[in-house]
Amino acid sequence: RQRQMCIRDRLIMAITSVALFVHIVVICAASTREVVANKEFVWYNGKRPITYSLPGSVSPVVTVALDMFKGDMQQVTGVLPQKTLFGTAVINIIQLDKNKSILRDLRKDGIPVDSIVARKDAFFIKIRENQLLVVGSDGRGTAYGILELSRLAGVSPWVWWGDVTPMRKERLTLPADYSTFQSPSVEYRGIFLNDEDWSLQPWSWKNFEPSDIKGRIGARTYKEIFKLLMRLRANAIWPGMHGITTPFYFVPGAKEAADSCGILIGTSHCEPMMRNNVGEWKVNERGDYNYITNREGVQSYWIERLKEAGPYENFYTMGMRGIHDSGMEGVKTLQEKTDALQQVIDDQRKLLSKYVDKDVEKIPQAFVPYKEVLQIMENGLQLPEDITLIWCDDNYGYMTRLSDEEQQKRSGGAGVYYHLSYWGRPHDYMWLCTTQPGLIYSEMKQAYDCNARRLWVVNVHDLKPAAYDLELFLDMAWNINSVSPSTLVEHQKSWLCREFGKEAGEKLLPAMLEFYRLCGIRKPEFMGWNQVELDKKKYTKGWSPVKNTDFSLTEFGGELDRYLESYEAIKEILSEVEPMIPQERKDAFFAQIKYPVFGAAAMSTKILEAQRARCISPGSCDTTLWTRESQLMAACAKSIKAYQEIRDLTDYYNNELADGKWKYSMCHNPRDLYVFYPPKVPVWLTDKEIEKYASLKRTKSLPLAEAVKDSCIVSNACDYTSASKGVVTIQSLGHSMNAVSVPKGKSITFEFDCLWDGEAILRTAVIPTQPNDKGDIRFSVSIDGEKPRICSIKEPFRSEGWKQNVLRGQAVRETGHQLTKGKHTLSITALDDHVLIDQWMIDFKPDRMFYVFPVQPTY
């Protein structure tokens, strides 16, 4: 009987191989007249359903991707694609690692099989004799190839999460010579669901899949997350780990859902061996989380999870810290910490070898030298070569360390943990996602160039608010050359056109560029000019109160008004574009464009109009600003109305958007921080008074050309007169939106006319990057060949200087100079790597109080 089964299996394999071979022969023999005549390949003609073939075996992730593709095509064409026989299908799909018997025949047909199979997650698509061939190196690669067809049909990756309903099409075509071969630049690419308490988590357990278990992000939710990651060509996740959230491995079906979607599970820097300590370690049951005094208990805890997780694809975090984001327990001196951590890692390797794979070097492992752990690593910790070093940013988008030349030689390579949202000092940003695209590009390209190519993970509190920034991050992880310093704007334009149509997308582009500029000047969450995690003895909760901003009502023709006017201008653009948006994309437009723009504008109005009201009210310290009562009332009314507008926008998001699909997903006041409170105005108005006064027009700011005549010369760095070879302008970065990367030893030079004599201050604004080694970030300035003045922007982590830099998005350094009327030359030279110059300003009134350099942005 066994012999009969063996013969049967061999016969099936032989038939399959022959069928595949015949299939390719049929492809080669098919008529090409239609393709040649029309110079295009028609894969849907509006009459018959799209057909596909899936010969041989495939991984579960391919089945999931195929179901997604079929659903996409049903929305695009109105007809569900049909599976058919070899040789007759429009689309033919092959997963190479499951069908090795066909490799020789594919080679004969000119398919670059060897190049495909040599790469993980790779796919190749080509039109062959009036049929479309999709070849994947493995399960994920095949799945990405299938979903690439959805992209080619105009389906957005945000079709479900962003409600970007596909547009119906009567015809789908590709160029007759179309082909693409894609493979990832970074091996593992994914997200860390963190600080999910006010968005993803309540939406999941209260709305999307209601549960009696408070805080549970269910398996259905995870499945939708994983499907989005598939569409974004990502393959890794660190699940939510807050105490209020049910641990991932406690959610029935969650790990199976990940496996079916080809998603690798990892954990953050304080969750070794796949354990969520915050939610899983119970001190009253297990004792102290202390490897010195409770080594057996800790190991038993780890072994439990290794037995459970071992059969699945994981990336194991090595080492040990405290239960949450704190140092290791039971050790005091640096040497004690080093010895203890060495023992932990040695023991963890033995456990992995015993319970996961005897060849421990084949198991993906990560070590995160974060906070105190970096000091321990540099104290002589012996870290096996195959373990991947995961470097972190400073929580605000600026990388703090990357592998040196020796570390870049490690077989385990390196990776990056990056933030698009954050809970902590100097201030949280967990409401909107406003990290400038140019900053993401600059920092991640630098990381890639330093060989951080094994794992990229980005911290997001939710998926929807981070849509564009998240996709840019993952686009770079998939193809590091998908964007460049000079194509960042084009990348965003393409994204907007894909989401909202060509005409609307092109009109939205200048508005969204301005949005990122204004948020780069100050994130909405930072508008209170206050901080968190301060001394609790001095401040209630450790939070300082909201105070007046550095925006001036009077300097440079009213920079406070100019900032508000800029927001009003982009709101007007959105109001003009909104009627152009197809009805089926209205929900997407609201969530991805209108809510963040109108919300950020309202936050600025709330804060700045309240500041105006306090300044012009009777009793103000600045009596020159006392004005008529109506102006005071108007400022109060505008501030209060803006506060209510944020609440109204959020109410619509949660209760009406997509018929309530996203209820509980948007919170306008995460952690209930002071910046989200009602405004501090001298007079709280009634609804009738608000209606009466809010419509009064504010005084307009002076045009910048007129405002800067007041004893200053100002320029964006990108407007240089000359530059050394290697100088590069990076779009969508800085207050200028075109910061300049100046390589070490290189310079940019400016010629300018001075209308005044005397002493002046040169203010040089630089992107507050961090040295990626133990070095510095220095530049020098020199006017007319004088002795260069050396400036450093290096600041200790969490120092007040560092805090102000990340809140402002610039590090400003001042130097004194003696100038005369006439022509002059300014030279700025980089003395270290990663110097990014944003703006400069020569000011003959060094004591003036202002915030923004008074110069037009350059788009």
What positions do the PLM features span?
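Feature activates predominantly on carbohydrate-active enzymes
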Residues: 112-293, 310, 366-370, 378-398, ...
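Structured mid-domain segments that build the active-site/substrate or prosthetic-cofactor binding neighborhood
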Residues: 230, 235-238, 245-248, 253, ...
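Contiguous, structured surface segment used for ligand recognition
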Residues: 29-183
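Extracytoplasmic
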Residues: 673, 680-859
